[in-house]
């Protein structure tokens, strides 16, 4: 790996570390410490996806029009620092201020969505180092530092939260964002070459069949993920899984992120050997199986095993949908293409936890939330099944 590529990989690691230091405890923290309802918790978690949904297409187009990548990546690190520093302030005032803290958490969580929107430019910045025919390989490679950093971030974040308090976990994220900002600031930009970007070229990009395929599958994947492992599984575990404690909050996401990171590294090879029309539906079927089993995974080890199944499914889906979105797009249009792809799946990131929160409240009986959680898991299993069928139909050979 060349020195420049190593620097980008390091920046990717710090980027996702700064964003994922606190999601492992955010929803349970919002309910227990900030007094947020299930719906408000869903909004706090979902604001991350909503802001991405709004910003990613404009950001992708802007990076292609201005032919700049680096400045938008740096803005992303800045937004991540603002988000985590703001949440640290909210944590400092928790228990001392009367009301309004959940709303402030919602606002600052939105800034983390603005940070994640810059993944549009950072991922394209990395893929520019590979020829078009090796895009799937590049996306498989980039997935490992992305998800491995999330594993480390969630473990350390939960540990720091339990030992020192939530405010210190948020400040850890701020420090990682600053380190990443300094690292990327030393790099030279790698502007795309080609014809000037126009509205006509954007329409041409948005109509690309592979981009549409990747985006449709990604939104279904994100709906399921953000309603479960990235949303309410931690709340479910704290309430109904025997032997689960606050000490396990950091371990819980690791049990899906680690297999996700490992499997992602080999997904391109599996796709070449067996075909995307097999690997992608298989990934969705694994997600569906995990969702169906959650209501019965009321033992700590069964829950962890279920998280592993979910993580393997994720690892089979993410690199291939991401590669599909840009592999047939010229380099000077990839910012717009990645913006479309990530904006579309941002709908799932926002809608997943919001809909899940409403389903949980609607199907719960008073203070007993078991029925609500079970209904949410069944809903997600159904969405995953739709994803499996869609993946087979959209990727089969014609």
Q: Where are the predicted features?
A:
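Juxtamembrane intracellular "pre-TM" segments in multi-pass secondary transporters
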Residues: 1-2, 188-216
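Helix-to-loop junctions at the C-terminal end of transmembrane segments
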Residues: 55-68, 263-275, 360
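Cytoplasmic helix-loop-helix junction between adjacent transmembrane helices
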Residues: 108-145, 324
């Amino acid at each position: 790996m060349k020195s420049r590529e190593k620097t980008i990989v390091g920046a990717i690691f710090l980027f996702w570390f700064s964003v994922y230091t606190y999601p492992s405890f955010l929803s349970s923290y919002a309910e227990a410490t900030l007094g947020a309802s299930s719906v408000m918790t869903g909004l706090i978690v979902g604001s991350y996806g909503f802001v991405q949904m709004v910003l990613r297409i404009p950001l992708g187009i802007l990076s292609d029009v201005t032919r700049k990548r680096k400045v938008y990546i740096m803005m992303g690190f800045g937004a991540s620092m603002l988000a985590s520093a703001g949440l640290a302030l909210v944590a400092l005032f928790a228990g001392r201020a009367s009301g309004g803290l959940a709303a402030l958490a919602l606002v600052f969580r939105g800034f983390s969505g603005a940070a994640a929107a810059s993944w549009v430019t950072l991922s394209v910045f990395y893929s520019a180092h590979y020829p078009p025919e090796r895009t799937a390989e590049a996306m498989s490679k980039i997935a490992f530092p992305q998800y491995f950093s999330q594993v480390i971030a969630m473990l350390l974040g939960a540990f720091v939260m339990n030992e020192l308090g939530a405010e210190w976990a948020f400040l850890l994220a701020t420090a990682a964002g600053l380190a990443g900002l300094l690292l990327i600031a030393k790099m030279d930009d790698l502007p795309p070459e080609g014809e000037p970007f126009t509205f006509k070229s954007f329409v041409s990009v948005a109509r690309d069949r592979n981009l549409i395929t990747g985006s449709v599958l990604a939104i279904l994947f994100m709906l399921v993920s953000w309603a479960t492992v990235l949303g309410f599984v931690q709340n479910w575990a704290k309430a109904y899984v025997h032997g689960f404690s606050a000490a396990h909050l950091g371990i819980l996401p690791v049990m899906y992120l680690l297999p996700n990171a490992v499997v992602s590294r080999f997904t391109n090879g599996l796709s070449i050997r067996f075909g995307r029309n097999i690997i992608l539906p298989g990934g969705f079927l694994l997600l569906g199986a995990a969702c169906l089993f959650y209501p019965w995974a009321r033992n700590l080890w069964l829950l962890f095993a279920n998280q592993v199944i979910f993580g393997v499914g994720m690892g089979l889906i993410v690199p291939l949908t991401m590669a599909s979105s840009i592999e047939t797009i010229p380099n000077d249009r990839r910012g717009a293409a990645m913006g479309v792809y990530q904006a579309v799946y941002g709908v799932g990131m926002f809608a997943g936890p919001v809909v899940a929160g409403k389903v949980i409240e609607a199907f719960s009986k008073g203070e007993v939330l078991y029925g609500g959680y079970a209904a949410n898991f069944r809903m997600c299993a159904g969405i995953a099944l739709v994803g499996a069928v869609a993946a087979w139909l959209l990727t089969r050979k014609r």
